[in-house]
Amino acid sequence: MSPAAGVPEMPALDASGVRLGIVASTWHSRICDALLAGARKVAADSGVDNPTVVRVLGAIEIPVVAQELARNHDAVVALGVVIRGQTPHFEYVCDAVTQGITRVSLDASTPVANGVLTTDNEQQALDRAGLPESAEDKGSQAAGAALSAALTLRELRARS
């Protein structure tokens, strides 16, 4: 899988000692399981041995579980997929999840990386899921972003 246009190369991270929480939905299980596998691989490659993994039914449940994980973790990864349908439900769910994840991150001063795919169709989600035939791996990218932000915050807080 070659990097998509505009996606930065993730540097190798030494995140040993970082407490990582991952919340992943179960709707569209093939996609969410692949996102989770990508996040776990980045965590392991970065020295995070046992991230806390919590599965929830749908994307709308992600923010409240991310909030709980943020209480005792240094970083959180939120993974899921919302695929556009024929009703405005897509917009409501996407907005609520995105705003919820952002609020949790700011309120807890803990990075919560948004790896929730919001796509027009299932193929777009599959293309981003980190499967062998996928163009991108948003689970890996989200985990890398969360760990990188946690290390940056650790460094900034050590200066205070």
Curated annotation (Swiss-Prot):
GO terms for cellular component: cytosol; riboflavin synthase complex. It catalyses: (2S)-2-hydroxy-3-oxobutyl phosphate + 5-amino-6-(D-ribitylamino)uracil = 6,7-dimethyl-8-(1-D-ribityl)lumazine + phosphate + 2 H2O + H(+). The active site is at residue 89. Its EC number is 2.5.1.78. PANTHER family: 6,7-DIMETHYL-8-RIBITYLLUMAZINE SYNTHASE (PTHR21058:SF0), 6,7-DIMETHYL-8-RIBITYLLUMAZINE SYNTHASE DMRL SYNTHASE LUMAZINE SYNTHASE (PTHR21058). Keywords: Riboflavin biosynthesis, Transferase. Transmembrane segments: none annotated. It is an enzyme of class 2 (transferase). Pathway: Cofactor biosynthesis; riboflavin biosynthesis; riboflavin from 2-hydroxy-3-oxobutyl phosphate and 5-amino-6-(D-ribitylamino)uracil: step 1/2. The keyword Transferase applies. (2S)-2-hydroxy-3-oxobutyl phosphate binds at residues 86-87, 128. GO terms for biological process: riboflavin biosynthetic process. Belongs to the DMRL synthase family. Signal peptide: none annotated. It comes from the Bacteria. One of its GO terms (molecular function) is 6,7-dimethyl-8-ribityllumazine synthase activity. This is 6,7-dimethyl-8-ribityllumazine synthase. 5-amino-6-(D-ribitylamino)uracil binds at residues 27, 59-61, 81-83, 114. Pfam families: DMRL_synthase. Homopentamer. Gene3D superfamilies: Lumazine/riboflavin synthase. Catalyzes the formation of 6,7-dimethyl-8-ribityllumazine by condensation of 5-amino-6-(D-ribitylamino)uracil with 3,4-dihydroxy-2-butanone 4-phosphate. This is the penultimate step in the biosynthesis of riboflavin.
